[in-house]
Amino acid sequence: MFVPRSLKLKRNSNDDLKSCEAKKSKPEAAGLQLEGNRETLVLESVTKEAVTADRPGSASSTSSPSCQLAEVCSTGPDQGVKDSHPSEEPVKSFSKTQRWPEPGEPVCVVCGRYGEYICDKTDEDVCSLECKAKHLLQVKEEEGSLKPSSPQGAASEPESPLDAFYVYKEHPFIVALRDDQIETLKQQLGISVQGQEVARPIIDFEHCGFPETLNQNLKKSGYEVPTPIQMQMIPVGLLGRDILASADTGSGKTAAFLLPVIIRALPEDKTPSALILTPTRELAIQIERQAKELMRGLPRMKTVLLVGGLPLPPQLYRLQQHVKADTMLKMGFQQQVLDVLEHTPSDCQTVLVSATIPDSIDQLADQLLHNPVRIVTGDKNLPCSSVRQIILWVEDPAKKKKLFEILNDQKLFKPPVLVFVDCKLGADLLSEAVQKITGLSSTSIHSEKSQVERREILKGLLEGDYEVVVSTGILGRGLDLVNVKLVVNFDMPSSLDEYVHQVGRVGRLGQNGTAITFINNNSKRLFWDVAKRVKPTGSILPPQLLNSPYLHEQKRKEQQKDRQTQSSLVTGANLMDIIRKHEKSSSQK
């Protein structure tokens, strides 16, 4: 069966071919698009494919992929499958009758033509019945190659069904470790945990008892051993606990929350089973791609990606009519996360994950999380230790010249270079200047560009098509830009948390990288924060910053505030002084 790239329509289910649905040429989405010039609240739901029982009396409700391929090949190239709705286009039988895709359109996984349809068995884009049958044959062969071969006559223990109810139990190896050994392990890995009855960290993915298909997907995706945040966060998530987690940029946080989501969604009948909110479209697209890699071959597992800037019907085709995700999208991203989560069940598991945990997130966690486990790996709210940070004092008129010097420096210049600026117009102008002056291939990316343009630019960045990409903050959070070795903060970010995220585009998963930041008196309110959080990493700060009166004034105010806080605390040493002050003030009244 095919699923069109538009909203589902009711069909007669007499046979597999009649149930194929063609995509409407231009789905009407007026009034459903979000404003493209702002950051977007993104909703992603892990859903299940509906299972339809065979009708009694029928020999078989589905045919094998090879039979489907033979059936397609016996049909003329110009013959499509017509249904009871004469106003709609017939489903294309052969790939050669399908057109080539335009930029940003889905691509057939078999032949590369326009992916007009979606195979509901694999959730992949296909262009015709012919490519659907070929694709299913490929999937069947891949699944056969994953099955472990056993010697003839040897009794092989059957693997438990993937949709069997999963209960996480600590591996015997983990149980056998003493408490002091666990604490030593946490200290060596930099894992800090707060909470009641917290699960012990795992040391290997095999300690989780995942289905073999998921273990194979982990290896194919490059996950050999868990990172520190994954060691602690995965077992806690598998037990259904609420989590507030902070870890270095590029430390594997996405897989740390995706694996428990996938496992807990396997036996669920209700759809959707999980909702993931991200601050940018690009991060949502990346998370969905990683989820699909990990879910490949697992039964009835699907994803839905809902982002602003694209027509909603093609994104909503997998959701049942009773799901209210489209309503939440139309409300606009400016609604707070609290408003969205009010629509979720009261007993659902909630996980908050970030590279930085400011006070606002701590306050939000107190409202959202029930008996949470707080997990921190690395230095909280500090840049990743594998990133070499360089802070340069550069006045605004000299910024372009300094950037061109860096791009011409053979020791520093390692393309592709990611340059962050604070406004959209500045991104466009700086990108043009870089290409004109240095001759390097350059482009800009920001929220005013269409989603199709942004996707193509991001793809080009990852594939090395651009030597320099000038961006606003939309590329500053969560994205795995593994080939980026140099980041330049042309404009100092508005907060140290944003600085940590932007610097974190290099140094992914322990790789070395360099981040160069231009700073001047326009960022004077951040001087003390920079000194506190960047200097401990070994970075040399410019003397203009260290000798600035703004820095010394901010330092004095913070020290005074700390002294006031200390004096308000009641201890054995100051208890009598507090009593005397209270008696004196009472007698004066």
From Swiss-Prot:
Q: Which residues does the UniProt record annotate as the domain Helicase ATP-binding? A: 234-375
Q: What is known of its domains?
A: The Q motif is unique to and characteristic of the DEAD box family of RNA helicases and controls ATP binding and hydrolysis.
Protein family according to the UniProt entry: Belongs to the DEAD box helicase family. DDX59 subfamily.
* Single Gene Ontology MF annotation: ATP hydrolysis activity
> Which segments carry the region annotation Disordered?
1-36, 48-98
As stated in the Swiss-Prot or TrEMBL entry, residues carrying the post-translational modification Phosphoserine are: 64, 156, 160
Provide the organism lineage as a comma list: Eukaryota, Metazoa, Chordata, Craniata, Vertebrata
- Disulfide bonds, paired cysteine numbers: none
Q: What PROSITE patterns would the database entry show?
A: HELICASE_ATP_BIND_1 (PS51192), HELICASE_CTER (PS51194), Q_MOTIF (PS51195)
Protein name, please? Probable ATP-dependent RNA helicase DDX59
Which residue ranges does the UniProt annotation give for the motif DEAD box? 323-326
